[in-house]
Amino acid sequence: MKYYNNILETIGNTPLVKLNKLTAEIPALVLAKVETTNPGNSVKDRMAVKMIEDAEKNGLLKPGGTVIEGTSGNTGMGLALACIIKGYKLICVLSDKQSKEKMDILRAVGAEVVVCPTNVEADDPRSYYSVSKRLAKETPNSWYVNQYDNLSNREAHYESTGPEIWEQTEGKITHFVVGVGTGGTISGVGRYLKEKNPNIKIIGIDTYGSVFKKYHETGTFDEAEIYPYVTEGIGEDILPKNVDFDIIDHFEKVTDKDAAIMTPKIALEEGIFVGNSAGSAIAGMIQMKDMFKKGDVVVVLFHDHGSRYVGKFFNKDWMRERGYVEPKNPTAKDLISTEGNLVVANSDESISSVIEKMTKFNISQIPVFKGEEIVGSINESIIFTYLFENPNSQSNTIEGIMSDAFPIADLNTSFENISKLITKDNPAVMVKKADGNYHIITKQDIIRAIS
């Protein structure tokens, strides 16, 4: 029989899933490390168990003890599972900006939840850092986890997450992208990957209101960078010991709005139901798209499950109240409705062959290629006129009768500019995708978009 002795043994070995739609404008292969398949539905399960086991080995956590931690919810869930299996009590201290779902889930697995105000300084006695420390002092036989400065956090990812990514990509990974909060994931994974290949780029996603990016670039801890933000799970107003800035190559900041808008898109367009930090990561990658090239293998880590955010980022009323609504300025990417293969003709192809293609696929215009180069276009009106004037000439090639090539746009060309390119004499526009292939937008696509 094959079974696990307890739920903690199921942690790890999470899948890599190719992203297909959201990252279409990124020329690289983009793979999501989906950590929601861990039993606590987040990457934090890995380090929660590691921190508890190391505390046990070092005599810091004794039988029947109480585990105390300040958490955004996910570490608390991992700790809760470990405490259930190992027989400890758990007190989780959360800031009031965390979703109600996170608090309810922690209570459901036996944790005592203490809620603190968000908009106070880190050293304020009301902050969740200060309250966690105070509770640890006041509670007999307790242990304060301190995931920010507890280096077992990043060791967990050095020992498990990093090796998994290296093995799953067969060592072909070129970039690792992840949101940064405590710094354990990026530092542990980053160190492992850099040891395997120093050329791998380690990229942290930060948020506005956090100190990470400026500190990384200037070495200055600037309190002016600190202000309230909505994004959950990433960014800090402190410098955790787990953040190894020497390993990180670049920080990219993402706004609350961009992260919020992207979060439900991951579920709707990729079928992957994940949380707000994943939205930040994808939005950040799109901002950095010029950093990646064809042949790169980019792994982006999705921290946690979308169920923790159904009352916020997946709630249209909540999003609308905060102005987190995507502006209605569609681009060529939005007009591409299918992912079927483009029907093309070769310049030396016969007229009869092109007629067969038009009939088979129910289309009225076709781009003409010579090798890999677009050299012209052909449509049913041109063919009709030519055959009317030149009967019995279906065997002739289209090279002598084709029109100019359709204009070429990129995925970000606006709907307005696409519309201007389509005229009576020019019935279609070619759109070049990030992978070098083409798609076609016709008059019918424009009509469908505005009707």
Which residues does each PLM region occupy?
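The conserved cystathionine-beta-synthase
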Residues: 343-362, 369-370, 387, 408-427, ...
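Bateman (tandem CBS) regulatory domains
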Residues: 247, 328-342, 395-406
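Short hydrophobic beta-strand motif reused across regulatory alpha/beta modules
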Residues: 364, 376-383, 438-446
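Methionine-biased hydrophobic packing positions in alpha-helices, especially
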Residues: 47, 51, 336-338, 358, ...
